[in-house]
C-alpha cells in the first residue's frame, strides 16, 4: 500500500512523445534539431515499430519519441520542459539557426524559455541551475 492509501502509484515518466509529419525529410529535421542542437542522440526504434515512421532520441533517462501523425498539427500548448545546462548558449545557437526563443512569464524562482521544434511543437527550456541557487 502506498502512503496515500492506494495499491498503485505512478513512479516517474518513462518518455515524452511528440507528433511529427510523415516522411524522411521530417525525420532529418527532427534529427538535426534534437540531436544536433539539443544534444540528444537518435537511437534506433525497435524493429516492430520502425515501419510506423518517426524517430526516438535518448540520453540517460531522457527519452523523446517523435511519432508520425498523417493529419499532423503541432502542439501549441501541451509541451515537455527540458532542463538544460548552458541554456544561454543553447538559446543563442537556436536563434542563430532560425529557431526563435521567447522568454516565458516566470514562475517565481524558475526562469523559462520556449522554442518551437521544426514542426511547431512547443518545447520549454529551463536552466539546470537557477540564478542565485
Task: For the regions a language model picked out, list residue spans one by one.
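N-terminal beta-strand motif that seeds the catalytic metal site of vicinal oxygen chelate
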Residues: 1-31, 78-80, 133
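Vicinal oxygen chelate
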Residues: 2-24, 58, 69-94, 96-133, ...
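A short linear hydrophobic-aromatic micro-motif
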Residues: 42-44, 65, 100-103
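Short secondary-structure boundary/capping segments
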Residues: 8, 55-56, 71-72, 104-105
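Core segments of cupin and vicinal oxygen chelate
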Residues: 17-62
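Short acidic/glycine-enriched loop/turn segments that link adjacent beta-strands
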Residues: 49-53, 74-76, 107-111
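Short amphipathic alpha-helices in soluble, non-transmembrane regions
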Residues: 30-32, 93-97
Amino acid at each position: 500500500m502506498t502512503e496515500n492509501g492506494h495499491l498503485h502509484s505512478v513512479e516517474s515518466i518513462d518518455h515524452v512523445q511528440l507528433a511529427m509529419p510523415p516522411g524522411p525529410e521530417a525525420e532529418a529535421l527532427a534529427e538535426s534539431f534534437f540531436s544536433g542542437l539539443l544534444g540528444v542522440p537518435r537511437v534506433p526504434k525497435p524493429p516492430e515499430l520502425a515501419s510506423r515512421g518517426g524517430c526516438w532520441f535518448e540520453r540517460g533517462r531522457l527519452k523523446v519519441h517523435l511519432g508520425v501523425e498523417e493529419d499532423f498539427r503541432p502542439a501549441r500548448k501541451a509541451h515537455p520542459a527540458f532542463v538544460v545546462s548552458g541554456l544561454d548558449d543553447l538559446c543563442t545557437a537556436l536563434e542563430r539557426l532560425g529557431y526563435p526563443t521567447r522568454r516565458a512569464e516566470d514562475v517565481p524562482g524558475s526562469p523559462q524559455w520556449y522554442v518551437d521544434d521544426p514542426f511547431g511543437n512547443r518545447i520549454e527550456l529551463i536552466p539546470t541551475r537557477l540564478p542565485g541557487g
